Protein backbone atom coordinates (compact mmCIF):
# COMPACT_ATOMS: atom_id res chain seq x y z
CA UNK A 1 0.00 0.00 0.00
CA UNK A 2 1.43 3.37 -1.05
CA UNK A 3 0.13 6.85 -0.24
CA UNK A 4 1.74 9.32 -2.70
CA UNK A 5 2.41 12.91 -1.68
CA UNK A 6 -0.36 15.28 -2.68
CA UNK A 7 -2.99 12.55 -3.11
CA UNK A 8 -6.18 11.64 -1.26
CA UNK A 9 -6.44 7.88 -0.78
CA UNK A 10 -9.40 5.96 0.66
CA UNK A 11 -9.26 2.68 2.56
CA UNK A 12 -12.59 0.87 2.44
CA UNK A 13 -13.97 -2.40 3.72
CA UNK A 14 -16.33 -3.93 6.27
CA UNK A 15 -16.06 -3.16 9.98
CA UNK A 16 -13.22 -5.11 11.56
CA UNK A 17 -11.28 -5.63 8.32
CA UNK A 18 -8.22 -3.65 9.47
CA UNK A 19 -8.84 -0.08 8.27
CA UNK A 20 -8.38 1.72 11.58
CA UNK A 21 -5.59 -0.69 12.51
CA UNK A 22 -3.76 0.58 9.42
CA UNK A 23 -4.02 4.15 10.71
CA UNK A 24 -2.72 3.07 14.11
CA UNK A 25 0.25 1.35 12.46
CA UNK A 26 1.05 4.51 10.51
CA UNK A 27 0.81 6.61 13.67
CA UNK A 28 3.04 4.22 15.62
CA UNK A 29 0.38 3.18 18.12
CA UNK A 30 0.80 -0.43 16.99
CA UNK A 31 3.80 -2.35 15.69
CA UNK A 32 3.53 -4.71 12.71
CA UNK A 33 4.12 -8.42 13.28
CA UNK A 34 5.82 -8.53 9.88
CA UNK A 35 6.67 -6.06 7.15
CA UNK A 36 7.22 -2.38 7.82
CA UNK A 37 5.48 0.97 7.69
CA UNK A 38 7.43 3.89 6.23
CA UNK A 39 6.43 7.52 6.59
CA UNK A 40 8.61 10.15 4.90
CA UNK A 41 11.29 7.50 4.45
CA UNK A 42 11.36 6.52 8.12
CA UNK A 43 10.43 3.07 9.40
CA UNK A 44 7.86 4.00 12.04
CA UNK A 45 8.30 1.03 14.41
CA UNK A 46 12.09 1.50 14.49
CA UNK A 47 11.89 5.07 15.80
CA UNK A 48 12.65 5.84 19.43
CA UNK A 49 10.14 7.86 21.45
CA UNK A 50 11.77 11.17 20.49
CA UNK A 51 11.81 10.29 16.79
CA UNK A 52 8.20 9.12 16.90
CA UNK A 53 7.17 12.33 18.68
CA UNK A 54 8.82 14.43 15.96
CA UNK A 55 7.19 12.39 13.20
CA UNK A 56 3.75 12.68 14.78
CA UNK A 57 4.10 16.47 14.79
CA UNK A 58 4.00 16.22 11.00
CA UNK A 59 0.76 14.24 11.04
CA UNK A 60 -2.83 15.36 11.50
CA UNK A 61 -5.67 13.15 12.69
CA UNK A 62 -9.43 13.62 12.45
CA UNK A 63 -11.13 11.17 14.79
CA UNK A 64 -14.50 9.63 14.01
CA UNK A 65 -16.59 11.97 16.15
CA UNK A 66 -14.17 14.89 16.33
CA UNK A 67 -12.85 14.20 19.87
CA UNK A 68 -12.84 17.89 20.77
CA UNK A 69 -11.83 18.91 24.28
CA UNK A 70 -15.23 19.60 25.79
CA UNK A 71 -13.96 22.07 28.40
CA UNK A 72 -12.17 24.23 25.81
CA UNK A 73 -13.62 26.74 23.38
CA UNK A 74 -13.42 26.24 19.63
CA UNK A 75 -10.50 28.68 19.57
CA UNK A 76 -8.57 26.86 22.30
CA UNK A 77 -9.17 23.47 20.68
CA UNK A 78 -7.48 24.63 17.48
CA UNK A 79 -4.75 26.51 19.37
CA UNK A 80 -3.90 23.49 21.54
CA UNK A 81 -1.33 21.91 19.20
CA UNK A 82 0.31 25.23 18.44
CA UNK A 83 0.78 25.93 22.14
CA UNK A 84 2.03 22.41 22.84
CA UNK A 85 4.42 22.00 19.93
CA UNK A 86 5.68 25.48 19.03
CA UNK A 87 7.15 28.55 20.70
CA UNK A 88 5.04 30.97 18.70
CA UNK A 89 3.83 34.13 20.47
CA UNK A 90 0.15 34.21 21.36
CA UNK A 91 -0.49 37.00 18.86
CA UNK A 92 0.72 34.80 16.00
CA UNK A 93 -1.18 31.79 17.34
CA UNK A 94 -4.34 33.88 17.29
CA UNK A 95 -3.80 34.83 13.65
CA UNK A 96 -3.14 31.20 12.69
CA UNK A 97 -6.12 29.84 14.62
CA UNK A 98 -8.49 32.31 12.98
CA UNK A 99 -6.94 31.48 9.60
CA UNK A 100 -7.59 27.75 10.11
CA UNK A 101 -11.13 28.39 11.32
CA UNK A 102 -11.76 30.69 8.37
CA UNK A 103 -10.64 27.88 6.05
CA UNK A 104 -13.42 25.63 7.42
CA UNK A 105 -15.99 28.44 7.53
CA UNK A 106 -16.12 28.82 11.33
CA UNK A 107 -14.07 31.90 12.19
CA UNK A 108 -17.24 33.45 13.60
CA UNK A 109 -17.70 30.50 15.97
CA UNK A 110 -14.31 30.76 17.69
CA UNK A 111 -15.79 31.67 21.08
CA UNK A 112 -18.34 28.83 21.16
CA UNK A 113 -17.97 25.70 23.27
CA UNK A 114 -18.17 22.21 21.72
CA UNK A 115 -21.57 21.63 23.35
CA UNK A 116 -22.97 24.55 21.34
CA UNK A 117 -21.94 23.06 17.98
CA UNK A 118 -23.88 20.84 15.60
CA UNK A 119 -22.29 17.55 14.59
CA UNK A 120 -21.13 18.98 11.28
CA UNK A 121 -19.66 22.09 12.91
CA UNK A 122 -17.81 19.99 15.48
CA UNK A 123 -16.29 17.90 12.69
CA UNK A 124 -15.14 21.07 10.91
CA UNK A 125 -13.49 22.38 14.09
CA UNK A 126 -11.75 19.02 14.48
CA UNK A 127 -10.55 19.34 10.90
CA UNK A 128 -9.16 22.82 11.58
CA UNK A 129 -7.32 21.36 14.58
CA UNK A 130 -6.00 18.45 12.49
CA UNK A 131 -4.34 20.85 10.03
CA UNK A 132 -3.21 23.36 12.67
CA UNK A 133 0.50 22.58 12.14
CA UNK A 134 0.29 22.18 8.34
CA UNK A 135 0.92 18.41 8.43
CA UNK A 136 2.43 16.41 5.58
CA UNK A 137 0.00 13.56 6.27
CA UNK A 138 -3.62 13.80 7.39
CA UNK A 139 -5.56 10.73 8.52
CA UNK A 140 -9.35 10.64 8.67
CA UNK A 141 -11.19 7.93 10.61
CA UNK A 142 -14.80 7.81 9.33
CA UNK A 143 -15.03 11.57 8.70
CA UNK A 144 -18.56 11.31 7.25
CA UNK A 145 -20.14 9.24 10.04
CA UNK A 146 -23.40 10.63 11.41
CA UNK A 147 -23.49 13.75 9.23
CA UNK A 148 -26.47 15.21 7.40
CA UNK A 149 -26.17 15.50 3.59
CA UNK A 150 -25.10 19.16 3.64
CA UNK A 151 -22.43 18.67 6.32
CA UNK A 152 -21.25 15.50 4.59
CA UNK A 153 -20.73 17.39 1.34
CA UNK A 154 -18.93 20.23 3.14
CA UNK A 155 -16.51 17.86 4.91
CA UNK A 156 -15.77 16.04 1.66
CA UNK A 157 -15.00 19.30 -0.13
CA UNK A 158 -12.80 20.49 2.75
CA UNK A 159 -10.79 17.25 2.78
CA UNK A 160 -9.99 17.70 -0.90
CA UNK A 161 -9.40 21.47 -0.74
CA UNK A 162 -7.18 21.44 2.35
CA UNK A 163 -5.12 18.53 1.05
CA UNK A 164 -4.44 20.38 -2.20
CA UNK A 165 -3.69 23.66 -0.43
CA UNK A 166 -1.17 22.02 1.92
CA UNK A 167 0.33 19.69 -0.68
CA UNK A 168 -0.20 16.95 1.88
CA UNK A 169 -1.21 13.30 1.65
CA UNK A 170 -4.57 12.23 3.04
CA UNK A 171 -5.83 8.81 4.08
CA UNK A 172 -9.60 8.50 4.42
CA UNK A 173 -10.96 5.44 6.24
CA UNK A 174 -14.66 5.32 5.43
CA UNK A 175 -17.81 3.34 4.70
CA UNK A 176 -19.34 6.23 2.75
CA UNK A 177 -18.54 5.02 -0.74
CA UNK A 178 -20.34 7.52 -2.94
CA UNK A 179 -19.11 10.66 -1.18
CA UNK A 180 -15.56 9.33 -0.96
CA UNK A 181 -15.36 8.43 -4.64
CA UNK A 182 -16.08 12.08 -5.48
CA UNK A 183 -12.89 13.33 -3.80
CA UNK A 184 -10.27 10.56 -3.74
CA UNK A 185 -7.49 9.83 -6.21
CA UNK A 186 -7.15 6.15 -5.34
CA UNK A 187 -8.92 3.46 -3.32
CA UNK A 188 -7.76 0.35 -1.47
CA UNK A 189 -10.35 -2.30 -0.54
CA UNK A 190 -9.40 -4.37 2.48
CA UNK A 191 -10.88 -7.66 3.68
CA UNK A 192 -9.60 -9.73 6.62
CA UNK A 193 -6.39 -7.72 6.76
CA UNK A 194 -5.58 -8.09 3.04
CA UNK A 195 -5.88 -5.75 0.06
CA UNK A 196 -8.33 -7.44 -2.30
CA UNK A 197 -8.79 -4.62 -4.81
CA UNK A 198 -7.38 -1.22 -5.64
CA UNK A 199 -7.73 1.45 -8.29
CA UNK A 200 -9.09 4.88 -9.16
CA UNK A 201 -12.63 5.89 -8.30
CA UNK A 202 -13.73 4.94 -11.81
CA UNK A 203 -11.98 1.55 -11.56
CA UNK A 204 -13.79 0.82 -8.30
CA UNK A 205 -17.20 1.86 -9.63
CA UNK A 206 -16.85 -0.60 -12.51
CA UNK A 207 -15.06 -3.36 -10.61
CA UNK A 208 -16.09 -6.94 -11.41
CA UNK A 209 -14.73 -8.20 -8.09
CA UNK A 210 -17.90 -9.52 -6.33
CA UNK A 211 -17.02 -8.17 -2.87
CA UNK A 212 -16.20 -4.70 -4.20
CA UNK A 213 -19.32 -4.61 -6.38
CA UNK A 214 -21.54 -5.55 -3.43
CA UNK A 215 -19.91 -2.96 -1.16
CA UNK A 216 -19.97 -0.09 -3.67
CA UNK A 217 -23.58 -0.61 -4.70
CA UNK A 218 -24.91 -1.59 -1.27
CA UNK A 219 -26.36 -4.93 -2.30
CA UNK A 220 -27.99 -6.87 0.54
CA UNK A 221 -26.60 -10.26 -0.44
CA UNK A 222 -23.45 -11.48 -2.13
CA UNK A 223 -20.00 -12.55 -0.89
CA UNK A 224 -21.02 -10.91 2.38
CA UNK A 225 -24.06 -13.07 3.06
CA UNK A 226 -27.32 -11.74 4.42
CA UNK A 227 -27.60 -14.81 6.68
CA UNK A 228 -25.20 -15.46 9.53
CA UNK A 229 -23.55 -18.90 9.05
CA UNK A 230 -25.29 -21.87 10.71
CA UNK A 231 -24.44 -25.56 11.04
CA UNK A 232 -27.57 -26.57 9.14
CA UNK A 233 -29.59 -24.96 6.40
CA UNK A 234 -33.04 -23.71 7.40
CA UNK A 235 -34.61 -26.39 5.19
CA UNK A 236 -32.61 -29.20 6.85
CA UNK A 237 -33.47 -27.89 10.31
CA UNK A 238 -37.21 -27.87 9.53
CA UNK A 239 -37.04 -31.36 8.03
CA UNK A 240 -35.18 -32.67 11.08
CA UNK A 241 -37.78 -31.23 13.43
CA UNK A 242 -40.61 -32.64 11.31
CA UNK A 243 -39.03 -36.10 11.37
CA UNK A 244 -38.74 -35.98 15.15
CA UNK A 245 -42.36 -34.91 15.48
Predicted features by range, described:
Residues 27:
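Helix-to-loop junction immediately C-terminal to a conserved catalytic motif
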Residues 44-60, 90, 204-207:
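ABC ATPase NBD coupling module
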